[in-house]
Amino acid sequence: MRCFPVFIILLLLMASAPSFDARPKTEDDVPLSSFRDNLKRTLRTLLDPRRCCYETPGCCVIG
């Protein structure tokens, strides 16, 4: 019975806690999906010999 008041107080504290991220977003908070998109685009460019060799001659892997 002694733990009951403590339990109630903890429940009240949890209910009043913010349910969202209270930190402000910065420029570094970029979604992971944009990193994946950039990676896919880079790999597609590197694996496409026509596009890679003509746009960036230094990255041509095929002779």
Curated annotation (Swiss-Prot):
Tissue specificity remark: Expressed by the venom duct.
Main location: secreted
Compartment(s): Secreted
Annotated protein name in UniProt: Conotoxin Pn-B01411
Record PTM text: Contains 2 disulfide bonds that can be either 'C1-C3, C2-C4' or 'C1-C4, C2-C3', since these disulfide connectivities have been observed for conotoxins with cysteine framework V (for examples, see AC P0DQQ7 and AC P81755).
Keywords on record: Amidation, Cleavage on pair of basic residues, Disulfide bond, Secreted, Signal, Toxin
Species of origin: Conus pennaceus (Feathered cone)
GO CC terms of this entry: extracellular region
GO molecular function annotation: toxin activity
UniProt xrefs under InterPro entries: T-conotoxin (IPR031565)
Entry domain remark: The cysteine framework is V (CC-CC).
Record flagged with keyword Disulfide bond: yes
Residue positions where Isoleucine amide is found in the record: 62
Prosequence residues removed at maturation: 23-49
Family: Belongs to the conotoxin T superfamily.
Signal sequence extent: 1-22
